[in-house]
């Protein structure tokens, strides 16, 4: 046929059987990728330390999505929470991966069958005998089935009525586990961080989809609307489908980047805004203050801070710190976290407690500045020592650790104090193993960053695709050069210029 590469899909334009075939093959590819990727991730995933080396630090992409839907156990005998399991059942990580691969194979065979047996009676208009599809009816069928699936997910899977529930955690990502969720029917259901909204919205949207599907199955579109929106043209279906997909992609890019109940930080890592707002830092200080109010010592109060909470308060876990084109997991960047060294408290020779000003998200380097509780600069690591007034040496800064591995240890020599001041810029201080993975020390983004970038980018591309195909189908007659008011029958090839009788071709 000699089609250019960007027009090859025209071969299925008026061929419903093979149009179905290529869509089944596409489903096979998607499902096969998901299953294969899951098996690859399971082969390289280390479940031994869910606190300091969780899935998002290791660059896992599909494991978090399985986990948030209720999969927590492996046939390898481990659980995502760090324990061991003896009977993981069929729906383990490997079981889900295998099911996707089996489904992919079945779709592959179905695609071949429909490619070979493309000329089925069901695709033919009984009045004309030519291939045609009743697109409004097909729309109603799909809407009804999607509504049933949506309702079923919300009413059964999420609520635990028939299913495991979903991953639910506290606001600080410490106590996450899979549990049943009751629908939230009040105003709180519209809070993106309330898990109950997931159940209620799926039930409501599913009900609406079922009713809308039944409506479109039982009511035919008016003729003027049918013609005006080109409902008989398959490219209209393509255009509106692309619109649905790019809209969904924009929405999930937002819920992933800004955070929501559907993207728990235990599975995808913290958001950049939690670093920007000092979210975990404030919670840590609140817990320490509560401990001091209970007459605990500073050391005891800091020792009660969960290592998991301290680890969230580290800039290396900020998804906006990794460049878009720095390939690899977070562990390949700053290394595998081994342990929390403790919280450093800096003091000058007059006994004032000093606080290191933290590095903002979009800085690669930042001056080391120590301020007192009133925000007055008291010490720094100067760029030019000849002009310094607040250097660690001049001010006599010391550091003492509370909690963690260095609990109770203090340093007064300036070189060590400056080392820990620099590291305190990056949040809580952790010992990082860079040797095991030959980590290069350059921060990487988490799966939260990759997912957002990918979906925002493709949403933009698909937006243009929607405009393109929508314009093609709405203005098809204009682009083809056919006057819609032309009464005479126009036969392509009769005239050199379509519809212009003065350019009639000579018969051969």
From Swiss-Prot:
Keywords annotated in UniProt: Chlorophyll, Chloroplast, Chromophore, Membrane, Photosynthesis, Photosystem II, Plastid, Thylakoid, Transmembrane, Transmembrane helix
Homology family: Belongs to the PsbB/PsbC family. PsbB subfamily.
Superkingdom of the organism of origin: Eukaryota
Gene: psbB
Any one GO MF annotation of this record: chlorophyll binding
Lineage of origin: Eukaryota, Viridiplantae, Streptophyta, Embryophyta, Tracheophyta
GO CC terms in record: chloroplast thylakoid membrane; photosystem II
Chain segments annotated as coiled-coil in the UniProt record: none
Membrane-related topology note: Multi-pass membrane protein
A Pfam short name: PSII
Transmembrane segments: 21-36, 101-115, 140-156, 203-218, 237-252, 457-472
Protein's name in the database: Photosystem II CP47 reaction center protein
Physiological role: One of the components of the core complex of photosystem II (PSII). It binds chlorophyll and helps catalyze the primary light-induced photochemical processes of PSII. PSII is a light-driven water:plastoquinone oxidoreductase, using light energy to abstract electrons from H(2)O, generating O(2) and a proton gradient subsequently used for ATP formation.
InterPro entries cross-referenced by the UniProt entry: PS_antenna-like, PS_II_antenna-like_sf, PSII_PsbB
Predominant cellular place of this UniProt entry's protein: plastid
GO biological process: photosynthetic electron transport in photosystem II
PANTHER family with a match to the protein in the record: PHOTOSYSTEM II CP43 REACTION CENTER PROTEIN
Self-association and partners: PSII is composed of 1 copy each of membrane proteins PsbA, PsbB, PsbC, PsbD, PsbE, PsbF, PsbH, PsbI, PsbJ, PsbK, PsbL, PsbM, PsbT, PsbX, PsbY, PsbZ, Psb30/Ycf12, at least 3 peripheral proteins of the oxygen-evolving complex and a large number of cofactors. It forms dimeric complexes.
Organism encoding this protein: Sorghum bicolor (Sorghum)
Co-factor: note: Binds multiple chlorophylls. PSII binds additional chlorophylls, carotenoids and specific lipids.
Compartments in which it is found: Plastid, Chloroplast thylakoid membrane
């Amino acid at each position: 046929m000699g089609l250019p590469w960007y027009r090859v899909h025209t071969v299925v334009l008026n061929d419903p059987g093979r149009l179905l075939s290529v869509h089944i093959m596409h489903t096979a590819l998607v499902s096969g990728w998901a299953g294969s990727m899951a098996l690859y991730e399971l082969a390289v995933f280390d479940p031994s330390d869910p606190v300091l080396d969780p899935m998002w630090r290791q660059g896992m992409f599909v494991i978090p999505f399985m986990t948030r839907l209720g999969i927590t156990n492996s046939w390898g005998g481990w659980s995502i929470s760090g324990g061991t399991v003896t009977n993981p059942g069929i729906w383990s990580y490997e079981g889900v991966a295998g099911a996707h691969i089996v489904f992919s194979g079945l779709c592959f065979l179905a695609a071949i069958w429909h490619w070979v047996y493309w000329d089925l009676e069901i695709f033919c208009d009984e009045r004309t005998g030519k291939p045609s599809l009743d697109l409004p009816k097909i729309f109603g069928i799909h809407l009804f089935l999607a509504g049933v699936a949506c309702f079923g997910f919300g009413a059964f899977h999420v609520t635990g009525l028939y299913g495991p529930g979903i991953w639910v955690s506290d606001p600080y990502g410490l106590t996450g586990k899979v549990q049943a969720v009751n629908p939230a029917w009040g105003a709180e259901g519209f809070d993106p961080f309330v898990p109950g909204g997931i159940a209620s919205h799926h039930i409501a949207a599913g009900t609406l989809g079922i009713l809308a599907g039944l409506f479109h199955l039982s009511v035919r579109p008016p003729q003027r609307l049918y013609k005006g929106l080109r409902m008989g043209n398959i490219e209209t279906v393509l255009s509106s489908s692309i619109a649905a997909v790019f809209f969904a992609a924009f929405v999930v890019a937002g819920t992933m980047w800004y955070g929501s109940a559907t993207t728990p930080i235990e599975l995808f890592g913290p958001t950049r805004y939690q670093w920007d707002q000092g979210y975990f830092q404030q919670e840590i200080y609140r817990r320490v203050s509560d401990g001091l109010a209970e007459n605990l010592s500073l050391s005891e109060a800091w020792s009660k801070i969960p290592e998991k909470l301290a680890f969230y308060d580290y800039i290396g876990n900020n998804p906006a710190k990794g460049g878009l084109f720095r390939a690899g997991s977070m562990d390949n960047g700053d290394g595998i976290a081994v342990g929390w060294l403790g919280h450093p408290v800096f003091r000058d020779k007059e006994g004032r407690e000093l606080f290191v000003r933290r590095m903002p998200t979009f800085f690669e380097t930042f001056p080391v500045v120590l301020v007192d509780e009133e925000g007055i600069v008291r010490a720094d690591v100067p760029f030019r020592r000849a002009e310094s007034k607040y250097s660690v040496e001049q001010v006599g800064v010391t550091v003492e650790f509370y909690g963690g591995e260095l609990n109770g240890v203090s340093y007064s020599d300036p070189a060590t104090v400056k080392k820990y001041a620099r590291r305190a810029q990056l949040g809580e201080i952790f010992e990082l193993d860079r040797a095991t993975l030959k980590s290069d020390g350059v921060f990487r983004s988490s799966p939260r960053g990759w997912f957002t970038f990918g979906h925002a980018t493709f949403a933009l591309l698909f937006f243009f695709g929607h405009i393109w195909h929508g314009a093609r189908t709405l203005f098809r007659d204009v682009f083809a050069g056919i006057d819609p008011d032309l009464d005479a029958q126009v036969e392509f090839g009769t005239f050199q210029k379509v519809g212009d009788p003065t350019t009639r071709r000579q018969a051969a």
